[in-house]
Design a protein with these regions (language model features):
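Mature catalytic core of soluble alpha/beta enzymes
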Residues: 1-291
Length: 291
């Protein structure tokens, strides 16, 4: 929702929002063989600079920075593992251990180096596949919010598949629990902030009576066995909320909060989160918002 009453450029404004979202989708969709990201992963030569557009460079820079800060708990290079498990297809395809080891050997954010002066990436091994799943929605929201502010829009609420951003007004956002989608496990008030949730129950697959979540642990190459059933992150940048909800789900409370403290101390990025513990259903929360 964008409030733009009595403004003659309304259609142009909304078309601009759609164009930005489409541009991100066409650039980053790893399931589209013609997206720029897919073409790069298919055509790059190990050790050779590969020039990219400004949007793809921004994505790579943002996601690799978070991968480094989280010590790989968030890692965009798990795309091949994600595809092998069938995540996104609706059908679980469990890899053998040896096969999984082979896939893990083709992951690792440290295999990618960026060249800002050339707007290029150097990937030093073959077979890297980059997954934008925990970045793309947040990045698109941030681009659109920046665009709306350039047009002096004062109030907006964006919803990209559960990734939210509220601008101007204060909204009360309900966070759904795992047992009953109609029951809220928490209500959060946000203004000029993004909200992103990672959980096993929003997107999962079943096979032989076992449930598999859609989030992959980069260390094991298997679906995450988290101490949380869900993690909801609140941050003034949607892309950080998107990435950090995934990182915290993988890391757990102690290691995750250390990452949040370093973000505030080194970059001034403030993050709140709340999570439901898997062991007892207790809601835990953390805030490092500057007052």
């Amino acid at each position: 929702m964008v409030r733009i009453e009595e403004r003659p450029e309304v259609n142009t404004l909304l078309a601009g929002c759609r164009d930005l979202a489409l541009q991100v989708e066409q650039t980053l969709n790893m399931y589209d063989e013609e997206s720029e990201l897919s073409v790069m992963c298919r055509d790059y030569r190990p050790g050779q600079p590969y020039e990219v557009t400004a949007l793809l460079y921004d994505f790579l820079d943002t996601s690799l920075s978070m991968a480094k800060r989280s010590n790989g708990a968030f890692d965009p290079t798990v795309g091949a593992v994600v595809k092998r498990w069938g995540i996104g297809s609706g059908e679980v395809r469990i890899p053998a251990e040896k096969e999984l080891t082979d896939f893990i050997n083709r992951t690792g954010y440290h295999h990618i180096r960026l060249l800002p002066d050339k707007r290029a990436a150097i990937i030093d091994i073959e077979g890297i596949t980059i997954d934008p799943g925990a970045v793309g929605k947040g990045l698109a929201i941030d681009y659109i919010i920046h665009y709306l502010k350039d047009y002096h829009v004062e109030q907006a609420c964006l919803d990209f598949g559960g990734n939210l951003y509220v601008m101007g007004d204060t909204y009360r956002i309900g966070v759904r629990g795992p047992e009953d989608p109609e029951k809220m496990m928490a209500i959060v008030s946000v203004k000029d902030q993004a909200v992103s949730t990672s959980s096993w129950y929003e997107h999962y697959m079943e096979r032989d009576g076992r449930v598999y979540g859609h989030l992959i642990d980069p260390a094991s190459g298997k679906p995450v066995e988290s101490e949380f059933t869900s993690v909801t992150v609140i941050c003034d940048r949607a892309v950080y909320a998107d990435m950090l909800s995934t990182a915290l789900y993988v890391l757990g409370a102690e290691k995750g909060e250390a990452v949040l403290r370093s973000l505030r101390e080194e970059s001034g990025i403030c993050v709140d989160y709340l999570a439901e513990r898997a062991v007892d259903g207790k809601i835990v929360s953390y805030s490092n918002t500057l007052k």
